[in-house]
Amino acid sequence: MRFREQFLGGSAAMPGATLQRACRLLVAVCALHLGVTLVYYLSGRDLSRLPQLVGVSSTLQGGTNGAAASKQPPGEQRPRGARPPPPLGVSPKPRPGLDSSPGAASGPGLKSNLSSLPVPTTTGLLSLPACPEESPLLVGPMLIDFNIAVDLELLAKKNPEIKTGGRYSPKDCVSPHKVAIIIPFRNRQEHLKYWLYYLHPILQRQQLDYGIYVINQAGDTMFNRAKLLNIGFQEALKDYDYNCFVFSDVDLIPMDDRNAYRCFSQPRHISVAMDKFGFSLPYVQYFGGVSALSKQQFLAINGFPNNYWGWGGEDDDIFNRLVHKGMSISRPNAVVGRCRMIRHSRDKKNEPNPQRFDRIAHTKETMRFDGLNSLTYKVLDVQRYPLYTQITVDIGTPR
């Protein structure tokens, strides 16, 4: 009996002492675990190594390792070296050598400068679609009136999308037609006002990526339309990578915005039915007034001739060049291709060229050495107005 009491008394004391020591050990291990966890959290180290360092089984971790710790889906692990997510409302501290600023590139040797990074926007993330082949903005036949008063300042305010120098591109689509419109010019300010008044809205409705270049011949020597067009081609390419060139007289206005001021697979004659000629084509070879050539087509014929001083002949020479290079002329129908001409008397120093018929007869020979490869001129002034760019040039004198 005494033996039993001694045994029971001893056994009652032993479990209490043992449990107390076990609890102290468990508290110490938990404190160590908490301390190591805190240190690793603040330093951004990999928490997946904690069980190996503290020697605590996954059962004692209580699900703080792996996917459960970062709320990751089962089977996914945080990459080695990745920072654990901070508590809600707490911003992560930068890591020396890795984070130079919030949002910096996370990797050694990578530099970040927030001021140089583009700010993501809806338009920046989503690329614009290509403009449709036929613009939905066209209205068709239009009334052209040359008796209205035109104020260029007011016109510029009504067309805020036009950039300085007469540059425009659609804001809601990307146009494949990068068009430079070249106007040979001298002393036609009133005509230019009407041209800008009517053409800018038309070109915008056609959804073209375009620029307007007025090539102004300085001095009072004989006018040379074709040479000015060559100059316009070269000068426009200094501004932008145009792929199409429309060559337009300043006194011609289209009466239908379906008459496209752009390039096609073949050279395009745009002013096919002028009121001056009773809204009909004067002759099959006629290529004057307004025409369009792609960059490749223009280069293939060595540009336009430089030796047609005075009125007439150069458009027929251009037609011959195209035919000799195996090209054909594309035209709109006589309804869409209607144009109005601003009536005016013939300019001084633009009298008919008496040599034009002889020169036209020899186009096949002269086109090899008369054109872009023989073009000489001097730019005297460049003015970029709100609605157009004017380039004043000295083109020399007839030889």
Swiss-Prot record:
<dbReference type="GO" id="GO:0009986">
    <property type="term" value="C:cell surface"/>
</dbReference>
<dbReference type="GO" id="GO:0007341">
    <property type="term" value="P:penetration of zona pellucida"/>
</dbReference>
<keyword id="KW-1133">Transmembrane helix</keyword>
<dbReference type="InterPro" id="IPR027791">
    <property type="entry name" value="Galactosyl_T_C"/>
</dbReference>
<dbReference type="GO" id="GO:0030198">
    <property type="term" value="P:extracellular matrix organization"/>
</dbReference>
<dbReference type="InterPro" id="IPR003859">
    <property type="entry name" value="Galactosyl_T"/>
</dbReference>
<dbReference type="GO" id="GO:0006629">
    <property type="term" value="P:lipid metabolic process"/>
</dbReference>
<comment type="similarity">
    <text>Belongs to the glycosyltransferase 7 family.</text>
</comment>
<dbReference type="InterPro" id="IPR029044">
    <property type="entry name" value="Nucleotide-diphossugar_trans"/>
</dbReference>
<keyword id="KW-0964">Secreted</keyword>
<dbReference type="GO" id="GO:0061755">
    <property type="term" value="P:positive regulation of circulating fibrinogen levels"/>
</dbReference>
<dbReference type="GO" id="GO:0016323">
    <property type="term" value="C:basolateral plasma membrane"/>
</dbReference>
<dbReference type="GO" id="GO:0042060">
    <property type="term" value="P:wound healing"/>
</dbReference>
<keyword id="KW-0325">Glycoprotein</keyword>
<dbReference type="GO" id="GO:0008285">
    <property type="term" value="P:negative regulation of cell population proliferation"/>
</dbReference>
<dbReference type="GO" id="GO:0004461">
    <property type="term" value="F:lactose synthase activity"/>
</dbReference>
<dbReference type="GO" id="GO:0008092">
    <property type="term" value="F:cytoskeletal protein binding"/>
</dbReference>
<comment type="subunit">
    <text>Homodimer; and heterodimer with alpha-lactalbumin to form lactose synthase. Interacts (via N-terminal cytoplasmic domain) with UBE2Q1 (via N-terminus); the interaction is direct.</text>
</comment>
<dbReference type="GO" id="GO:0009312">
    <property type="term" value="P:oligosaccharide biosynthetic process"/>
</dbReference>
<dbReference type="GO" id="GO:0007160">
    <property type="term" value="P:cell-matrix adhesion"/>
</dbReference>
<dbReference type="GO" id="GO:0030057">
    <property type="term" value="C:desmosome"/>
</dbReference>
<dbReference type="GO" id="GO:0009897">
    <property type="term" value="C:external side of plasma membrane"/>
</dbReference>
<dbReference type="GO" id="GO:0060054">
    <property type="term" value="P:positive regulation of epithelial cell proliferation involved in wound healing"/>
</dbReference>
<dbReference type="GO" id="GO:0005886">
    <property type="term" value="C:plasma membrane"/>
</dbReference>
<feature type="compositionally biased region" description="Pro residues">
    <location>
        <begin position="82"/>
        <end position="95"/>
    </location>
</feature>
<keyword id="KW-0735">Signal-anchor</keyword>
<dbReference type="GO" id="GO:0060057">
    <property type="term" value="P:apoptotic process involved in mammary gland involution"/>
</dbReference>
<dbReference type="GO" id="GO:0005576">
    <property type="term" value="C:extracellular region"/>
</dbReference>
<feature type="glycosylation site" description="N-linked (GlcNAc...) asparagine">
    <location>
        <position position="113"/>
    </location>
</feature>
<dbReference type="GO" id="GO:0008378">
    <property type="term" value="F:galactosyltransferase activity"/>
</dbReference>
<feature type="binding site">
    <location>
        <begin position="313"/>
        <end position="316"/>
    </location>
    <ligand>
        <name>N-acetyl-D-glucosamine</name>
    </ligand>
</feature>
<dbReference type="GO" id="GO:0048754">
    <property type="term" value="P:branching morphogenesis of an epithelial tube"/>
</dbReference>
<dbReference type="GO" id="GO:0000138">
    <property type="term" value="C:Golgi trans cisterna"/>
</dbReference>
<dbReference type="Pfam" id="PF02709">
    <property type="entry name" value="Glyco_transf_7C"/>
</dbReference>
<keyword id="KW-1003">Cell membrane</keyword>
<dbReference type="GO" id="GO:0060055">
    <property type="term" value="P:angiogenesis involved in wound healing"/>
</dbReference>
<dbReference type="GO" id="GO:0002526">
    <property type="term" value="P:acute inflammatory response"/>
</dbReference>
<keyword id="KW-0479">Metal-binding</keyword>
<dbReference type="GO" id="GO:0005794">
    <property type="term" value="C:Golgi apparatus"/>
</dbReference>
<dbReference type="GO" id="GO:1905517">
    <property type="term" value="P:macrophage migration"/>
</dbReference>
<keyword id="KW-0464">Manganese</keyword>
<dbReference type="GO" id="GO:0005989">
    <property type="term" value="P:lactose biosynthetic process"/>
</dbReference>
